Amino acid sequence: MTTTEQTQPDQLGTLRDRVTFVTGGTRGIGAAICRALAGAGAAVAAGYWHQHERAQQFHDEMLAAYPGSEFTVHEGNIGSADDCRRVLSEVIDRHGRLDILVNNAGITIDRTVAKMTDEDWQRVIAVNLSGAFFMAQAALEHMLERGSGRIINVSSVIGETGNIGQVNYAASKSGLFGLTKSLAREALFQLGRAGHPVSDGIGLTVNAVTPGYIATDMLGTIPDKVLDRIRSQIPVGRLGNPGEIARVVCFLAADESAYITGQIWAVNGGLDM
């Protein structure tokens, strides 16, 4: 059955023979990204933490929805540098290579500044920002050896606007902007030093996508009155759906995006205008 989260027919095959790894890939936006990448022909590995039954269920759903596709799930704590390196190595060992990394994993621990503990701050930064760095660091080493690759960081409109009670989350997501731009510059610099021409082929690019308010489980705890107020502030008048984020990620992962790097792609219904 076709859903808004699945890739449209004209996208099929654009990522054939590519291997992708999506952190936080078994639910919400991450699951939609996995579906879109698989629909475009890629072999997909999805990262998760703790939720074994959900991960196995999603694994089975993916194999049923995309017969003949390669799809694996890998458990790891994104907040641990050692786990990041281990999981990425596991993905490469399993699939033989890595072409595309999507840093999607993220958590929230919401508190006002006065009530936020050291652990509240450090945990969110560790998963949302440090984890993205450690994953990208390990992926870049492999991609530079091969001479090509894609890294796509999933940030948030909250990283641009800030939000009461989310200073840790906003800081982590804003940090991804600087991480993206610096990685993009360094990737091309190192690519040239390694003797790979930066002007030919698909290149090695790093970009970010900044979703607005997307209809996922993460919004499930927000009261209806608050959601109505949020909708009223969005120029297009509605929440986004995960598939709309996934389609942008698919484009940035494709060869056709080779001239785009170090950029922040806002997908938020005009919320930041």
Task: Kindly give the residue locations of the regions a language model identified.
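Conserved glycine-rich Rossmann-like NAD(P)H-binding loop of the short-chain dehydrogenase/reductase
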Residues: A40-Q57
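Active-site helix of classical SDR
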Residues: A136, S172, T180
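Residue(s) in the substrate-gating loop at a strand-loop-helix junction
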Residues: S156
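Substrate-binding pocket helix/loop in short-chain dehydrogenase/reductase
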Residues: T112-V113, D120-I125, I151, L219, ...
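Short, small/polar-rich loop/turn modules that mediate ligand/substrate recognition or access, typified
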Residues: L188, G192, D200, T205, ...
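Conserved glycine-rich cofactor-binding loop
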Residues: V19, T26-R27
